[in-house]
């Protein structure tokens, strides 16, 4: 499994953020796109220097860093800049790959967190390419999907309403995707055994091996 999708925020938390965004200043999303992807990006973003964006960054980071599955999957070292994006009917973002490096460091994992109620828009699915095919992801309000930044992905056209999301990038303690997945599987398996059978000397050895890897 090279991506994870789960519920991060409640509907109440999302609505609180959406209420904050009523007074936000929105700019052309192409300002933050690379030259090769700029023409295919049709959306708006909250100005990076705004206080509202900084407040949302803090809310999202605290929620992510306190979620056991996210910590296990990402082994996060740093959350880079967070963008708040609004895509209206007719907008989307053509196929692109995120930058491998940012001014604040390496970007190993990318994420999208849906703030809008799924009934507030149509279309706008996130499509991520794998080696053999593509995965089309539709997010409910408060759901987040995290995937390797090396994967080609696109936001399909929004056909009705407005899609408001947070997108961001994570630097992991492990750069290599295979290593991260192995650690995630080991941690998930060990915690599953602990929940099912309780603690044992053998399981302690598994946790010891995980810690020392």
Regions found by a protein language model. Give the residues of each.
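Catalytic core of non-heme Fe(II) oxygenases with the double-stranded beta-helix
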Residues: 68-184
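Non-heme Fe(II)/2-oxoglutarate
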Residues: 1-76, 81, 182-213
């Amino acid at each position: 499994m090279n991506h994870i999708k789960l519920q991060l925020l409640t509907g109440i938390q999302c609505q609180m953020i959406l209420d904050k965004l009523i007074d936000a200043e929105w700019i052309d999303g192409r300002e933050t796109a690379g030259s090769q992807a700029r023409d295919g990006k049709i959306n708006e973003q909250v100005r990076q220097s705004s206080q509202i964006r900084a407040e949302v960054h803090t809310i999202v980071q605290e929620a992510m860093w306190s979620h056991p599955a996210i910590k296990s999957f990402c082994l996060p070292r740093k959350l880079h800049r967070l963008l708040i994006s609004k895509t209206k009917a007719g907008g989307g973002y053509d196929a692109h790959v995120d930058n491998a490096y940012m001014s604040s460091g390496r970007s190993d994992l990318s994420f999208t967190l849906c703030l809008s109620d799924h009934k507030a828009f149509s279309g706008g699915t996130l499509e991520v390419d794998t080696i053999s095919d593509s995965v089309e992801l539709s997010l409910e309000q408060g759901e987040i999907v995290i995937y390797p930044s090396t994967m080609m992905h696109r936001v399909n056209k929004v056909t009705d309403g407005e899609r408001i999301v947070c997108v961001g990038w994570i630097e992991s303690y492990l750069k290599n995707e295979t290593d991260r997945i192995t650690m995630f599987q080991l941690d998930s398996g060990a915690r599953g055994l602990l929940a099912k059978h309780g603690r044992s000397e053998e399981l302690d050895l598994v946790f010891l091996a995980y810690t020392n890897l």
